[in-house]
Amino acid sequence: TGVQTCALPIYGYQIAGFADRTTLVDNNTWNNTHIATVGKAMASSEERAYPILRKHDVDYVLIIFGGLLGYSGDDLNKFLWMIRISQGLWPDEIQEHKFFSNGEYRVDDQASATMRNCLMYKMSYHRYNDLFGGRAGMDRARNAMGPSTSPTLDTLDEVFTSENWLVRIYQVKKEDTLGRPLPLAHAFEQGKRLHQAPFPLNADAIVH
């Protein structure tokens, strides 16, 4: 109890019912600003999304990713309506056309910089290449290759990924105790890990 999760509104009831946790929005949310806020966080870069999540006391972020399983009803395929709702309130900050590449909604290396840098994209493909020996992996939901390099996250920690990678949960980091910007603190920790045993590059590395 006391833990708040950020997810698409359609998952709010399930999270509340099965996990006894509150969500920022759910199916019954009538306040369009709340829904747009979730969309804004997902559509923003980590740098811009982190203050939004912290302001609303979000502890965890849950997404549904169908790339490995081939589930086309995942959050990346629902992402555009989140972008549109957010653009309605913040047209100067969230602009749908910036998520397209030459008019196409792409997820491979030809995806737009805005798409590749947004929180939704990073959470979806974080460590995905680990399953394919470090190479780009096939996204079966979109019938396209994913990015050649898996995105890294500075402000979130992966705490759960289901065996088929459908459910992914990330914990929002607290501010660094030494006052460092989180990207700098993360880079320092990554440097320390280079001297430790490597994280296994296969599906067994999933956090259960």
Where do the language-model regions lie?
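Extracytoplasmic
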Residues: 1-208
